[in-house]
Amino acid sequence: HHSSGIATITFCWNKHNGIAFPVDYRGRDAEGELIPGMDAAIIREALREFFETYQGRLTYHSIAFDVYILIYQLFMQHILDTEGLLHGLEVMLRSWDCTKLIAYLATNSCAGNRLDLKSNSHEFSGNYSLGEEIKDVTQIELFRLLEYNLIDGLSTWFVKEKYEPIMIQDNQLQIYEEIFKPAIKDIIQMQLTGMPVNMPRSIEVNNHLTTEQERLLQKILADPII
């Protein structure tokens, strides 16, 4: 997350309409060099303001990845910026759904299931893959990346409409709201800064264990057999 960026982003208001636009990525010039995004900082500030003020519900597919990146890139100044982290968690997790979690609860069985967006929206969006799993989006032509990003957003709406009724019909809504969604906050925080640790208590326990280790070692070394 600290070495990532926000290449492009998409917002869709239903499964047929949306917009995608560049943030940090502007494509490459004729020599193959990255074109600098001169207005990236302005767009980032606008995105942050949008997320802070928007009162509607946002839907993601794999929120544990998307929001994890967005919090670090839009709200944190550095890896130890706890204030920015907590503010970002409050803002980004105010009202949301995750179609990956919904799909899991709607399709989970002993036979297994696939939770990736493309598999679950294939009948709607077809095969829009850009080939192998994307490792570096800056190697993709900007127009193609924007198109790909937009189809992702539209497909997320489709998957929500497809599986949310099934999740509710199967009496999984309470599990979704009371177990899965609360866990996401802890998961994202741990992804950003590691597992929360009570440092004073950790130091206290470490000192106790170190003392006990030394005591037992001396006891072993003092044994005549040794």
Model features per residue range: what roles?
Residues H1-S4:
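Entry/capping segment at the start of metal-dependent catalytic domains
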Residues C12-K15, T193:
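Short strand-coil-strand connectors
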Residues I6-A7, N14-Q169, I187:
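Active-site-proximal helix-loop-helix substrate-binding element of RNase H-like nuclease domains
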Residues I175-I226:
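Extended, well-ordered alpha-helical scaffold/bundle regions in very large, multi-domain proteins
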Residues I6, L142-L150, Q172-F180, M199, ...:
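Amphipathic, non-membrane alpha-helical segments in soluble helical-bundle scaffolds
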Residues P165-D170, T193-V197:
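Inter-helical turn/loop segments and adjacent helix faces that build the functional surface
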